[in-house]
């Protein structure tokens, strides 16, 4: 007797109540088998600084075809002095992207609120601020021409991902339920101070200088006592901050240093009457582009 015949015979020999119970069991099994398989969505690609830069500034060339627009965006990026800021901004976005997309916050909207807190030039002022002109030739092609070389200043800005999110929320970032995002960025692994200067290494979205003594020497006079205190704080391990609590609250630092640090943490820069050079100036390289036809 075949397997099918055996099943039919067994089913026929069942009492009526047992037969109905078996039918219900078979029906449930069939429904489970026909349900669509739930696919786990693939992890989305991390957004890097150039992707964010291109997304934000590309509308500057909206009147041009894509084949002309892309090379111009590459040229602007190569000579943009805010690579660290863009990497940081987009790395924070990547780490909370799932939460933001649930509330319809796109990359463009995130950047709109974030750029102002990192000193990045807004889109409408970008070309004029960096001396760029879009030139149109008689044959209809275009090129970029640079007519001015501005001096770009980077202020010392202690900041982490949670700080950037908080500033964006305060300036109007539309998140109906920000608590889950705040919890994500409150994890100790994200709680490193980010300094706006090169060279750097990137851990998650927190950027920390490799050679703190180089950065400190650019801000303070040689052998100044405050410089030694800042350098000591920069090199403290993450575990120290988790144990100690808020940044710079330990006892033993000079009143001069604590006053300076309070000004930086509250305002993003030193007070106007502070004698130290808190602006790290970087010259934008001189470059001309004229591929005339």
Swiss-Prot record:
Entry's Gene Ontology BP terms: positive regulation of mating-type specific transcription, DNA-templated
Record has Nucleotide-binding as a keyword: no
GO MF terms, alphabetically ordered: DNA binding, bending
Segments forming a coiled coil: none
Keyword Nucleus attributed: yes
GO cellular component: nucleus
A Pfam family the protein falls into: MATalpha_HMGbox
Location of the protein in the cell: Nucleus
Keywords: DNA-binding, Nucleus, Transcription, Transcription regulation
Regions recorded as binding DNA: 42-97
Its biological purpose: Mating type proteins are sequence specific DNA-binding proteins that act as master switches in yeast differentiation by controlling gene expression in a cell type-specific fashion. Transcriptional activator that induces the transcription of A-specific genes like mating factor ccg-4. Required for mating as an A-cell and for blocking of heterokaryon formation (vegetative incompatibility).
Protein family (similarity comment): Belongs to the MATALPHA1 family.
Name of the protein in its database record: Mating-type protein A-1
Organism: Neurospora crassa (strain ATCC 24698 / 74-OR23-1A / CBS 708.71 / DSM 1257 / FGSC 987)
């Amino acid at each position: 007797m075949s397997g099918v015949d055996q099943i039919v015979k067994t089913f026929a020999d069942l009492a009526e109540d047992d037969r109905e119970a078996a039918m219900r069991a078979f029906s449930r099994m069939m429904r489970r088998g026909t349900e669509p398989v739930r696919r786990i969505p693939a992890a989305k690609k991390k957004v890097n600084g150039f992707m964010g830069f291109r997304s934000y500034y590309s509308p500057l060339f909206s009147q041009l075809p894509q084949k002309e627009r892309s090379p111009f965006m590459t040229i602007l990026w190569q000579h943009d002095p805010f690579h660290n800021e863009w990497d940081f901004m987009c790395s924070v976005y990547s780490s909370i992207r799932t939460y933001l997309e649930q509330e319809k916050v796109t990359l463009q909207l995130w950047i709109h609120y974030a750029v102002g807190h990192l000193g990045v030039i807004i889109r409408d002022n970008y070309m004029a601020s960096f001396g760029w002109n879009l030139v149109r030739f008689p044959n209809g092609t275009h090129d970029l021409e640079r007519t001015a070389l501005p001096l770009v200043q980077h202020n010392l800005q202690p900041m982490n991902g949670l700080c950037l999110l908080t500033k964006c929320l305060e300036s109007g970032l539309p998140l109906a339920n920000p608590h889950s995002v705040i919890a994500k960025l409150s994890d100790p692994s994200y709680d490193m101070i980010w300094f706006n200067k090169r060279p750097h290494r990137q851990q998650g979205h927190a950027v920390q200088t490799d050679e703190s003594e180089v950065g400190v020497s650019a801000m303070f006079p040689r052998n100044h006592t405050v410089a030694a205190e800042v350098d000591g704080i920069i090199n403290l391990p993450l575990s120290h901050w988790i144990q100690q609590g808020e940044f710079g609250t330990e006892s033993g630092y000079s009143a001069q240093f604590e006053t300076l640090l309070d000004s930086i943490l509250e305002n993003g820069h030193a007070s106007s009457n502070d004698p130290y050079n808190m602006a790290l100036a970087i010259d934008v390289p001189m470059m001309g582009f004229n591929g005339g036809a």
